[in-house]
Swiss-Prot record:
GO CC terms in record: extracellular region
Subunit structure: Homodimer; disulfide-linked.
Tree of life domain: Eukaryota
Cross-referenced InterPro entries: C-type_lectin-like, C-type_lectin-like/link_sf, C-type_lectin/snaclec_domain, C-type_lectin_CS, CTDL_fold
Signal peptide range in chain numbering: 1-20
Protein's name in the database: C-type lectin mannose-binding isoform
Length: 158
């Protein structure tokens, strides 16, 4: 019985230590996930201004990149909890060469895509930036003009 209790307590200590390691370096109100910290901002900015805002935190910060269904679900829940008003949210995916080749602003792999049905459609030939669509609970993406004013989510390593 004593050994079982010792092993159980040891496992709890390790579990709490790992949880703390995941969140120890993120500022308050930032979401720790996969070695990054994420923060949604209620300000309205165009895509370029939002990306520059994120970069000013520290080198290596960008609009968020999303690489799995699990990441998408966690970010959607976080945004729903912390965004003070309804509206779309910029992410780091864009088409800087205007050739329908989507890249993340942090240059990470585009190994995961979550377009809403019928997207990307490049309506009026002017949609080169991507936002999380509020109407889908922030789970699906839409291409839109980069000049649109939306909330945004930054991704940083602290």
């Amino acid at each position: 019985m004593g050994r079982f209790l010792l092993v159980t307590l040891s496992m709890l200590v390790v579990t709490f230590s790992l949880n703390e390691a995941n969140s120890c370096c993120c500022p308050q109100d930032w979401l720790p996930k996969n070695g990054f910290c994420y923060k949604v901002f209620n300000d309205l900015k165009n895509w370029n201004d939002a990306e520059m805002f994120c970069r000013k935190f520290k080198p290596g910060c960008h609009l968020a990149s999303i690489h799995s269904n699990a990441d998408s679900a966690d970010l959607a829940e976080y945004i729903s909890d912390y965004l003070k008003s309804d509206g779309h949210v910029w992410i780091g995916l864009n088409d800087p060469r205007k050739q329908r080749t989507w890249v993340w602003s942090d240059r990470s792999s585009t190994n995961y895509l979550a377009w809403n049905q019928g997207e990307p459609n490049n309506s009026k030939n002017i949609e080169y930036c991507v936002h999380l669509w509020a109407l889908t609970g922030y789970l699906k993406w839409n291409d839109t003009p980069c000049e649109a004013l939306y909330h945004f989510i930054c991704q940083c390593k602290f």
